[in-house]
Amino acid sequence: VAKVVNAALGRMAVPFFACVTGYFLTKHEKKDSRGWIKNIKSLLSYYVVFSVIYIIWGFTQHEFAGLSAGDLIYTIVKRFVMYGTYYHLWFFPCMILGVVILHFAIKWKREKIFWIIGILCYVFGACTYTWYGIGEHFILGLDRLMQWFDFTYIHRFTTAILPFTFLGNYISAVEN
C-alpha cells in the first residue's frame, strides 16, 4: 500500500496542482489580466518563507561551509531561481515560470501552440525518466544530458509543470 501511495498517488500532486493552477488562472485572466501577478505573489510569499527556513537549516547543517561570500550568494540565488532552495521546493520556481508562460500565451493568443508543446514536452519527459530508460536508446546523447545536474530541474518543469498547466488551460477553454 505504501508503495502505491508513494509511487502513484504521491506523484500526482504536483501535476494536479499545475493543472488546477492553469485552469483557474485561465478563468481569472479573462476577468482580470493581472491575475497572474496575484498568483505569482501568492507563490512567492510561501516560497520566500520556506526558503528562509531551509537556508537557515542549511547553515545549521554546515551545507555552506567553506564557501566564500560571493559563492554563498551565487549558490543561494541560483537555488532560489532555478532549483528551489531545498530539494523538495523545486516546484515553486517551476510553477512561477509556468504561470508566466501561461499568462503570455493567453495574452498573445498562443495557447494552442503551447498545448502541442506541452504534449511534446510530456512525451519527451516520459521517455527520459531514468526508471524506464527508454529515451537513452532512441535519443542520441541523452545519457550525457541526464548526468547534467540542471537537467533534472529542466526535466521536472517540462514534464510535470508545463504540460499540466496547459492541460488546465485546455480544460478551461473547452469548458467555455
Model-identified regions with their sequence ranges:
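Hydrophobic alpha-helical segments with transmembrane-like composition
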Residues: 10, 17-18, 24-26, 54-62, ...
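Coil-to-alpha-helix initiation sites in intrinsically disordered, low-complexity, charged segments
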Residues: 35, 68-72, 140
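Membrane helical hairpin/interfacial module
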Residues: 2-67
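Membrane-interface interhelical loops and short amphipathic "cap" helices
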Residues: 1, 138-146
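Membrane-interfacial loop-to-transmembrane alpha-helix junctions, especially the N-terminal start
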Residues: 34-43, 111-118, 176
